[in-house]
Structures are given as C-alpha cells and as structure tokens.
C-alpha cells in the first residue's frame, strides 16, 4: 500500500482548504476527489490525516480525521549555510539533498568570491524545492530557506549552535573532530570561488572551526552533501551504528 499523498497548507483546524499550486496538483495531476484520503502538513511537525469533503473550481475542502506527530525529523538540530551558486539547478540540488538528509535550517549567502546573487523569485523557488523534497522523503517539516546578503550575516544567524563548522579548502587539518560530534551543529560551505583567508579568520573569530573534506577539491554542491552526510552520521541520524546525540538551538 503506497503512502498517502502529502500537501502543505497554511492553517488546519477541524477542516482545511487546499488552494493554489497544491490544489492544482491534487485535482489536475493526482485526480483526487471526494472521499480520497491525504496527509496535510502545516510545518509544525504534526501530520493530519484528512478526507476530501468537496472540490470546487479553485479549492478543495478537507475534513481532519486524525493527527499525529511526524517521526522522520532529526533528533539533533542541524543547519547548512551555503554560498549561493551561479547555476540554479545546483542550488536546488543542495536544498533538495539537505532536506532529504534531515537539515532543519538552510541559509544561502553571498560572499567575497560569489558571482551570483539572490532575488525574491529565486528564493521562492528554493522554498518550493524544500517543500517538495520534504513531501518526497516523508518529513513533516520543510526548512524555510533564508538568504543572507553577506557571510558575516550568515555566521551571525548560526551563533546559537553548539558546534560550528566552516568548510575551507585551504585548511591543512580540521580544527574539530567531525566524527565525534555531540549536540546541535551548523555547517558553512562556500560557493564556486571558495573563501578568502580573511573570511576564514572572520569565521574563526565568531567561533567556527575550520574543517577540511580531504585533499581533493570538491565542487560546492558535492561539499555540501558530503559534509552534511558526515555530520548526520556522526550525530546518529543515518544509521543505528552511530551514537544518538541530541542538542538544542
């Protein structure tokens, strides 16, 4: 039996209404109608099992049958800040994989060597990717992708995390042991041009530990997935063989 289709809505009470793109997808693509059951999500971590009560021209009314807590969220808060890339598909890939791996907070930023800049439409697109990825991997929470105009702004947004990792291609060795992490963790990965020495110094002054991902130079999107995977495994989020570590932000 396949899992029920999942949709994000703004508000849920005893009833809920699907509108906009979610409605169009439910009605015109999935051909859902009266009597069909779905799962609605309001980004609170809860999952609402609902039944379609009526379908109008531009909306779908659903009655709530039951509510439960989602069980796919990571126990340890993890954040990823990445340098915004020129290639839109690569930015979407980073967001998609971060969501699939369980990241709670995502920040795109511009830095000294960045050659691409964000606008409202691009940010909206990344948030749509976040929601679609959350639905695909059965998460009950879709991280809101935020944009920081400077690296410093991004670093300051991550000050509440217990572990702060700064992936740096010219770091000779890691200042933190990413294999034995405990508690909430923030990661920062640069854009195509990487970071300057001054940016590394800034990060270090704000409590970030420089880390290396090995002797080979990785593409930015590869570095994001690699570091996120390492961190999630270290925190016990990718298998029973690693130690579970909880943290708060």
Please report, for each region that a protein language model flagged, where it lies by residue:
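N-terminal positively charged helical leader segments and presequences
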Residues: 1-70
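Short, ordered loop/turn segments at secondary-structure junctions
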Residues: 67, 111-114, 215-216
């Amino acid at each position: 039996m396949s899992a029920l289709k999942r949709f994000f809505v703004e508000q849920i009470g005893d009833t809920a209404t699907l509108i906009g793109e979610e409605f169009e997808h439910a009605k015109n693509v999935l051909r859902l109608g009266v009597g069909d059951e779905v799962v609605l999500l309001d980004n609170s971590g809860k999952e609402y099992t609902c039944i379609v009560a009526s379908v109008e021209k531009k909306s779908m009314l659903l009655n709530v049958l039951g509510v439960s807590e989602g069980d796919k969220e990571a126990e340890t808060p993890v954040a990823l800040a990445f340098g915004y890339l020129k290639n839109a598909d690569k930015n979407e890939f980073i967001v998609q994989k971060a969501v699939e791996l369980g990241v709670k907070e995502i920040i795109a930023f511009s830095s000294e060597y960045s050659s691409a800049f964000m606008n409202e439409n691009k940010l909206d697109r990344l948030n749509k990717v976040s929601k679609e990825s959350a639905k695909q991997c059965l998460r009950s929470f879709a991280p809101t992708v935020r944009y920081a105009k400077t690296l410093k702004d991004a670093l300051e947004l991550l000050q509440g995390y217990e572990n702060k990792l700064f992936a740096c291609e010219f770091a000779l060795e890691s200042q933190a042991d990413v294999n034995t992490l405990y508690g909430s963790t923030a990661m920062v990965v640069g854009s195509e041009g990487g970071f300057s020495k001054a940016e590394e110094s800034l990060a270090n002054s704000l409590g970030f530990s420089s880390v290396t991902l090995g002797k080979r130079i990785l593409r930015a999107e590869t570095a994001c997935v690699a570091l996120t995977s390492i961190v999630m495994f270290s925190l016990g989020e990718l298998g029973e063989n690693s130690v579970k570590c909880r943290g708060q932000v």
